[in-house]
Design a protein with these regions (language model features):
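Conserved non-cysteine loop/helix-boundary elements of the Radical SAM core domain that shape
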Residues: 1-114
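A broadly tuned preference for mixed-charge, low-complexity surface segments
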Residues: 4-5, 64-66, 131-140, 178-182, ...
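Low-complexity, flexible helical/coil segments
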Residues: 21-23, 43-51, 84-91, 114-123, ...
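Short, glycine-/Ser/Thr-/acidic-enriched flexible segments
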Residues: 56, 134, 170-173
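A C-terminal junction/extension of Radical SAM enzymes
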Residues: 90-167
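Radical SAM enzyme core and accessory elements
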Residues: 143-217
Length: 217
């Protein structure tokens, strides 16, 4: 199991807690799915939990953000990240940016500020921040943590000091080596058929990279 392999935290990322919005953005999970998984993890494991929410989704209102923060404050996951919607070229939501159902920038800013106020009132503190291109209202993504529950991995990622091993089509792995923090990346093919045909060679290449960077035998 993950616990036996040393995993100590898990991300459960609802994005928002309204089924109509989840369907609108093409997510395959429901609010019930999120809650059942969270309760299972809390009741049966010692894993720390991170939850991600997005401000600025299609048809999203301030009432929706209030519902999201109500859920967080009732369940108190160790880490919470509030993202601002970033409409990237090529993403399924990109074509929606000219439609009226994307919230106005001032409303998105109010959602982000409300999330900050609710989380801090519940005992969370901000501990990392980053920005992306195309973010609504030139805002940012902010990670919050309960006291003594900060995820060091997130901090290291922001500082470009963290290796990442990813799996599956379209995934991207990154190797970092101290003290100079040189990095090397490997990108998996997005096409599933190409991925299946080339997976053995890609895994062999990954093993060689691991040996070179981490002196794995």
């Amino acid at each position: 199991s993950m616990l036996e392999l040393g995993v100590n935290r898990i991300s459960i990322n609802p994005q928002t807690m309204q089924d109509n919005i989840l369907r609108r953005i093409g997510r395959g999970h429901s609010v019930r799915d999120v809650d059942e998984l969270l309760q299972y993890v809390k009741n049966n494991t010692s894993l720390a939990v991170n939850m991600d929410f997005i401000a600025g989704l299609p048809n999203q209102t301030m009432s929706n953000m209030i519902e999201n923060m109500d859920y967080v404050c009732q369940n108190l996951p160790e880490n919470v990240t509030i993202h601002t919607l970033a409409l990237k070229r090529g993403s399924p939501l990109y074509d929606l940016q000219m439609q009226d159902d994307i919230p106005e920038e001032n409303l998105v800013a109010e959602m982000v500020q409300y999330g900050k106020a609710r989380l801090e009132a519940a005992g969370y503190v901000p501990y990392y921040l980053y920005r992306q291109q195309y973010m609504r209202g030139q805002l940012e993504n902010i990670g919050y943590t309960l006291p003594d529950k900060a995820c060091e991995y997130n901090i290291q990622i922001m500082e470009e000091r963290q290796s990442i091993l990813s799996m599956g089509p379209g995934s991207s792995s990154k190797w970092m080596r101290a003290p100079e923090y040189r990095q090397l990346k490997q990108h998996m093919p997005k096409d599933v058929d190409v991925y299946h045909v080339t997976i053995d060679a890609l895994l062999e290449k990954r093993h060689r990279i691991c040996e070179r960077f981490w002196e794995v035998v």
